[in-house]
């Protein structure tokens, strides 16, 4: 049974994220910085600090690069609506197919306003 689970996990690998990624607070990323990371071979940037689902910076980071994945780490369910998260994901997926990874989690409800 364990071997089957290991094989399944290997099949579900996220190769499109690349071997290396960069994580920092979401407002610290710039389109120029993301492009530089992409040029250095990074496969993904992870936007920490619970960015809002409707943050306008996602599109700027994606538009300023060609292939790197922009991933949220995480959008906090206590600070956004399901509709806002879905709208953002669908809009960015249409414009930048396969390059926006929406990470959603419960985070810390006491840190939301």
Residue ranges and their predicted role:
Residues 2, 15-23, 82-113:
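Flexible, glycine-rich active-site loops centered on histidine and acidic residues
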């Amino acid at each position: 049974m364990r071997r089957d689970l290991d094989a399944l996990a290997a099949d579900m690998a996220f190769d499109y994220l690349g071997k290396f990624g960069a994580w920092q607070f979401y407002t610290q990323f710039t389109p120029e910085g993301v492009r530089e990371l992409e040029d250095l071979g990074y496969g993904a940037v992870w936007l920490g600090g619970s960015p809002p689902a409707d943050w306008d910076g996602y599109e700027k980071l994606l538009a300023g690069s060609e292939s790197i994945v922009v991933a949220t780490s995480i959008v906090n369910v206590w600070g956004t609506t399901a509709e806002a998260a879905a709208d953002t994901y669908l809009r960015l997926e249409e414009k930048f197919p396969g390059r926006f990874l929406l990470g959603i989690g419960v985070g810390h409800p006491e840190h939301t306003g």
